[in-house]
Amino acid sequence: MQPTATMATAAATTATVALTTSWDNATSRPTAEPDPILDNYVLLVVVMSLFVGGTLVVLSGVLLLCKRCWEVHQRFNRAMEEAEKTTTTYLDNGTHPIQDPDCRGEDPEGQDTETERFLATSSTGRRVSFNEAALFEQSRKAQDKGRRYTLTEGDFHHLKNARLTHLHLPPLKIATIHECDSGEASAAATPHPATTSKDSLAIFQPPGKTLTGHSVGPSSALPGGPYNSVDFSEISPSTSSDSGEGISLDAGTRGAKAAGPETVPGEMGTGSSGSGTVLQFFTRLRRHASLDGASPYFKVKKWKLEPSQRASSLDTRGSPKRHHFQRQRAASESMEQEGDVPHADFIQYIASAGDSVAFPPPRPFLASPTSPPPTLGRLEAAEAAGGASPETPPEHGISLGPEHAQQQDPQQEQDAEHAQCSYRDLWSLRASLELHAATASDHSSSGNDRDSVRSGDSSGSGSGGGGAAPAFPPPPESPPALRPKDGEARRLLQMDSGYASIEGRGAGDEVSELPAPARSPPRSPRAWPRRPRRDYSIDEKTDALFHEFLRHDPHFDDAPRHRTRAHPHTHARKQWQQRGRQHSDPGGARAATPPGVARPTRAPLRRGDSVDCPPEGRALPITGDDPSIPVIEEEPGGGGGGCPGSGLCVEPAGALLDKLAASLDERLFSPRLAEPVASSQVLIVAAAAPTSPDHSPA
């Protein structure tokens, strides 16, 4: 128990009482001396109190010092750990990031200590290592302005499993939200009254209803499932006037329908104050919720690289740690559209037309009359303005004006009624599309041999100014369109371009160039003429093409099999790949040999051989191949009795030349060396005659 100030005062009062008592005693007995034990006790108490107070002061100072040292130690340790687990190392060029002008007024000191510490370490030309997660923490300022909520594949599967789990929750109501710039965020967050009184365009019905052909739209977003279903509110087209891409929060007006005890009704629709963060979250989450939804119709903004986020350049640089996420993002986002286009048009067109016209199953990806075509990587930008509509058969022409499109409108309505009974799901629709493409390409007058393109019927290109819809019952024959010039022809590389180069113009092309009589499609689907089934068997052309690409060494199979080991040879095709890697055409060099000369037979290559030099241990083939250097062999008795010593005899020059010519004549199959060699100059020419070694396989 430590002495306190109260105890010290109590001791002092005790000492005073004792002093007065001894004073009284001294007056009565003046000669008596004071008690030495009592004096020692008082002195002891005073010294003890002084000692304890000093100890307390020293201890508090030591503790403060230790605390300060511990903080410094922790900071140093944290810096070391960040340097160990760093993900990036940049060579800092001394340019300090300028602070964002929006965030400047928020904190008086400018930036927090993390940034200051990072900037303090970065002097010119030093290597700066840091943990990029610490820098991404800065993006929490300015209400998460550049923040993007990216779903990785793990999150995606987790969400998928969560969707299949039966939670007893009422269906969640989600407003479909377009991404808008920060300037429009205030206008976009204010709720607009719903313009139509009809029920919302419900892409996913609650589990009570049956899923009809209407209810399953082409964009199958993730949150709606067999159990936890989602109603997507429609977009009111009136909002396109004030903000370029408006958000209709009809969930505010009709939110009471779906709000149960678990849902928070104020979260979605009530005020712009409460719903701002949720709207922002769904704005960023919308694209990732479905990987393939209606993405071609939306403009995808690039990531905003804030100046304080130095590590965000990793998204554009190809660092191997990010490749997986770049692939995931590329799978989930559509490509950037060129130019500034109104991106909300498609959904507003659907919402204003009502859900009866929104997703007619025969033509699911028709764009609105004003919206641009979806950007496909295979389409050229120059052709995007006037291309044919998605599945338009080629007879409908390459450029259809709006007048032509309006002539065909009653026809389209009729065809849509017919087709709604037959195309119930995506797969039957796709099969019918393929059949339609097959028959249309038979009648087509677009030259496959010239363009290397199947006509644009199955390419899925979008419609420029309101192109004609596909007529799925037998296509009405309009007069054949003019062929585009070769310069303007689309260079779409399709699957059948290989066939187009092989087959040339088929017989069907000439037939269909005759003007066909106009015929109207029969009324009932059963009366339609039976389309040819698609044949998936491989014909001879495909087989020949296939084997042409997979050809291998022809002498390999003819050689007798060596059974000495289990696998004496490399596999034929593998060996073929390893041998002729650098030569384009295997048969080209040998094809020009004169027919009278017999090709030398070559033993099959064994493991480790190259094409023309066998390894040192193995002798040259007896039949003799083309050697790169002519080998001059000695005569059998050459080293023997004629010249004792080393066998280097000086023979007359004529005999030596005759010998050389004879051996060259045996070794080379060229008829040029048949005449006798006269002089040494001709010999030089003859020795140079074996041309550079032939690297093609035998």
Curated annotation (Swiss-Prot):
Residues 459-468 have a biased composition (Gly residues). Residues 483-493 have a biased composition (Basic and acidic residues). The modification Phosphoserine is found at S290, S295, S501, S520, S524, S610, S692, S696. One of its GO terms (molecular function) is transmembrane transporter binding. The chain crosses the membrane at residues 42-62. Keywords: Cell membrane, Cell projection, Cytoplasmic vesicle, Glycoprotein, Membrane, Phosphoprotein, Synapse, Transmembrane, Transmembrane helix. It is a single-pass type III membrane protein. Residues 185-197, 402-413 have a biased composition (Low complexity). One of its GO terms (cellular component) is secretory granule. Negatively regulates voltage-gated calcium channels by preventing the interaction between their alpha and beta subunits. Thereby, negatively regulates calcium channels activity at the plasma membrane and indirectly inhibits calcium-regulated exocytosis. This is Voltage-dependent calcium channel beta subunit-associated regulatory protein. It comes from Mus musculus (Mouse). The lineage of its organism: Eukaryota, Metazoa, Chordata, Craniata, Vertebrata.
